[in-house]
Swiss-Prot record:
The active site is at residue 74. It comes from the Bacteria. This is dITP/XTP pyrophosphatase. Homodimer.
């Protein structure tokens, strides 16, 4: 495993909600985090079929364009009754014809698909959020970290915090959705903590322990 020495890196994302969460998680570690959006980098085509492949595509593109280490996140909601969908195509389910993204529409699509399967009771609506972080260097070296959190898809959506599918995901052991939690509650982790709640925080915990010794 390669240690990260630089204190400036690029967040390889154009997703405002994701950039905010990554900055919230990496800020306490003392990093200055620029984003691919801030630097006007072109978004690479995510042609991978796994979270790991897409995270690597994004991180390498930003690392090579900036000459700095880059950190990407590829994440999604995997619903068991839907065979793991939306999965790596989580963002695609939110795409409108004009290219914009509408996650209210995406959540409705998931709910419609579940009802079509007769998945009404909580035990038939199990799901997990997956996050894969990729840390890439300009020389092409990459490190990957995967975090998952188990839960259920609920309906109707609850809460206005977070982003994406957060209002319909209720983690196991909780009676609130990610959309009803503050950022601190959702992640449940800061450097040095032994536990984390969200998928992204669990991936960050591995990243911090492995590449930073934190």
């Amino acid at each position: 495993m390669r240690r990260l020495i630089d204190k400036t890196l690029v967040v390889a994302s154009h997703n405002a909600g994701k950039i905010r969460e990554i900055r919230d998680l990496i800020g306490p570690l003392g990093f200055e985090a620029k984003s691919a959006a801030d630097l006007n980098f072109v978004e690479p085509d995510e042609t991978g079929t796994t979270f790991e492949e897409n995270a690597t595509i994004k991180a390498l593109a930003s690392a090579k364009a900036s000459g700095l280490p880059a950190l990407s996140d590829d994440s999604g909601l995997a619903v068991d009754a839907l065979g793991g969908a939306p999965g790596v195509y989580t963002a695609n389910w939110a795409e409108r014809e004009d290219g914009s993204r509408d996650f209210q529409m995406a959540m409705e699509k998931v709910e419609e698909a579940l009802r079509a399967k007769g998945a009404v009771k909580p035990e038939s609506r199990t799901a997990r959020f997956v996050s894969v972080l990729c840390l890439a260097w300009p020389d092409g070296h990459v490190e990957l970290f995967r975090g998952e959190v188990e839960g259920y898809v609920v309906w109707p959506p609850r809460g206005t915090s977070g982003f994406g599918y957060d209002p319909v995901f209720q983690p196991k052991g909780y009676d609130t959705t990610f959309g009803e939690m503050s950022a601190e509650e959702k992640h449940g982790w800061k450097p040095g903590d032994s536990e984390a709640l969200s998928h992204r925080a669990r991936a960050f915990k591995l990243f911090a322990e492995t590449c930073l010794g934190a």
